Regions:
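Short, well-ordered coil/turn segments that N-cap beta-strands
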Residues: 1-2, 36-38, 72-77, 101-104, ...
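Catalytic alpha/beta core domains of metabolic enzymes, predominantly
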Residues: 164-231
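Conserved N-terminal beta1-alpha1 strand-loop-helix module at the mouth
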Residues: 1-53, 59-69
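N-terminal small/glycine-rich loop or linker at the start of catalytic domains
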Residues: 1-17, 74, 127, 133-142, ...
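Active-site beta->alpha loop and helix N-cap motifs at the rims of alpha/beta catalytic domains
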Residues: 39, 44-154
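Active-site glycine- and acidic-residue-rich loops that bind
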Residues: 19-21, 139-149, 176, 199-205
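Conserved, mostly hydrophobic/aromatic
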Residues: 12, 32, 106, 165, ...
Length: 231
């Protein structure tokens, strides 16, 4: 079975600056709680109060609890953290300590070239934050998908701390055959890590690429309603 994570509110927030009406959110949760979606990524948690970003970039514990109650018991609630806002493990511990027992999963979108820095932060944070599952989204797949050795090296670095990694076509430029060939190799060579995918729709191929990755053995896929999201 392929696990589905819907990130409509989080990724769709790039269109609305994370402002969503209560009515829209209510209708969204009425629908998503009935769909075969395993995990719902509802936005960001952030201590950065600059700018005019809406509630779904600055989610608080009370609101997250309310959202979680609208999901099925077997659905997990997830949030993204803007890795650029985290300078050290103390920042991350301070931020996440407010959400233990509320958030099931946090994800970081990380440039593979900076993986060591963020893995060190996550490793230290996990010693204090025990009830949240940490995952990484590896960005810029189109830049390095031809280099299987590089991809395996990055995934191997993550293995002891991260059990699930989503590979992200940040520019939405990959083609289905490229996706199939890459995921066929990378999944078969990393059987102890759950490999997921996240495709952007710049070329109108996000759905086709997702299906190609699943056909190649990818075990987790990100989705949004109507393809709403960055790119």
């Amino acid at each position: 079975m392929v696990k589905i994570l819907d990130c409509t509110l989080r990724d769709g927030g790039y269109y609305t600056d994370w402002h969503f009406s209560n009515l829209l959110v209510e209708k969204y949760f009425q629908s998503i709680s009935k769909l075969p979606v395993d995990e719902v990524e509802v936005g960001y948690v952030s201590d950065n109060q600059k700018g005019n970003s809406g509630l779904y970039y600055h989610l608080n514990k009370t609101h997250l609890k309310n959202l979680k109650q609208r999901l099925r018991n077997n659905q997990k609630i997830c949030c993204m953290i803007n890795a650029k806002e985290i300078k050290n493990h103390k920042d991350l511990i301070k931020l996440l300590s407010k959400f233990e027992g509320t958030i099931d999963v946090v994800r970081f979108s990380v440039d593979p070239l900076k993986i060591d820095f963020y893995l060190n932060i996550i490793r230290k944070t996990k010693k204090k934050i025990k009830k949240i599952n940490f995952r990484i989204n590896l960005m810029y797949l189109s830049k390095w998908f031809k280099d299987i050795n590089f991809a395996n090296k990055i995934i191997n670095k993550c293995k002891s701390d991260i059990k699930e990694i989503a590979l992200v076509d940040s520019y939405g430029s990959l083609q289905p055959l490229q996706v199939f060939n890459f995921f066929k190799k990378i999944v078969s060579q990393n059987k102890n890590t759950l490999i997921g995918c996240h495709f952007h729709n710049n070329c109108g191929l996000a759905l086709a690429n997702t299906l190609s990755a699943i056909e190649a053995g990818c075990r987790s896929a990100d989705s949004t309603l109507k393809g709403m999201g960055r790119g």
